[in-house]
Swiss-Prot record:
Record organism: Buchnera aphidicola subsp. Acyrthosiphon pisum (strain 5A)
The organism's taxonomic lineage, starting at the top: Bacteria, Pseudomonadati, Pseudomonadota, Gammaproteobacteria, Enterobacterales
Protein name: Phosphoadenosine 5'-phosphosulfate reductase
Enzyme Commission numbers on file: 1.8.4.8
Active-site residue list: 239 (nucleophile)
GO biological process, alphabetically ordered: hydrogen sulfide biosynthetic process; sulfate assimilation, phosphoadenylyl sulfate reduction by phosphoadenylyl-sulfate reductase (thioredoxin)
Family, similarity comment: Belongs to the PAPS reductase family. CysH subfamily.
Length: 244
């Protein structure tokens, strides 16, 4: 299927679009992560970015993609409440891989938000959703528009949570192609790749964190906990970036 034809999927009605996406997802399911990335870089629209939280295992997708497209813009959404270790990790990886890092954040500073709304993360699911919208969803939407993004690479995996278990390799959201190259990777495969390529993990991994977001809504992974329960007090898994 040619790049020209794929770009024009957005012009089709929903039924035809879904049929083509189903065919492409079947194709991608037989590819390795490296092959999916190569295919996407060649066949999907060329205004391409990847997003990264610079979390526990973020190095894997960064490494896979920059081997093939070193200058790809890497979008980071900075809430202002990341762990100090995360900010240091961002600096370290940016220097190590010469990342084309693009940082976006809310137009309202964290201090001003607290003055205006209080600690939203302490106000139940509605407060958390409002917080995520201000600090993550709105900045990401601005980034996608500012960079005229057509193709978005992300590192979501099926085994990270129930909400991600049925995600496809390729989807179209608001006219943007979204590709998930390591969707079918297991935790063991992630660990093996990190070890084989001598890659760094987030500094908090050795302190018992399996997932890292904001300081106030992230817990250590305790025995018996699901990974998704370490975020947002177990009330939800997604921050909103990958829900719509």
């Amino acid at each position: 299927m040619s790049k020209f034809y794929i770009e024009n999927i957005n012009l089709l009605n929903s039924e035809k679009k879904n049929n083509i996406l189903s065919e492409l997802n079947l194709l991608l399911s037989n590819y390795s992560a490296e092959e999916r990335i190569s295919w996407a870089l060649s066949h999907l629209p060329h205004t391409q970015i990847m997003s990264s939280s610079f979390g526990i295992q973020s190095t894997v997708l960064l490494h896979l993609i920059i081997k093939k497209k070193p200058d790809i813009p890497v979008i980071l959404i900075d809430t202002g409440y990341l762990f100090p270790e995360t900010y240091n990790f961002i600096d370290f990886l940016t220097n190590k891989f010469h990342l084309n890092l693009k940082v976006f954040r809310s137009t309202i500073s964290s201090a001003w938000q607290e003055a205006r709304y209080g600690k939203l993360w302490e106000k139940g699911i509605e407060g958390i959703d409002f917080y995520n919208n201000i600090n993550k969803v709105q900045p990401m939407n601005f980034a996608l528009n500012e960079l005229s993004v057509q193709t978005w690479f992300a590192g979501l995996r099926h085994d990270q949570s129930k909400s991600r278990n049925l995600l496809p390799y390729l989807s179209i959201k608001k006219g943007i192609f979204k590709i998930l190259p390591i969707l079918d990777w297991s935790k063991d495969k992630i660990k093996d790749y990190l070890k084989e390529n001598n890659l760094d993990t987030h500094p908090l991994y050795n302190d018992g964190y399996s997932s890292v977001g904001d300081t106030h809504t992230t817990k250590k992974h305790m025995p018996g906990m699901l990974e998704e329960e370490t975020r947002f007090f177990g009330l939800k898994r997604e921050c909103g970036l990958h829900e719509n």
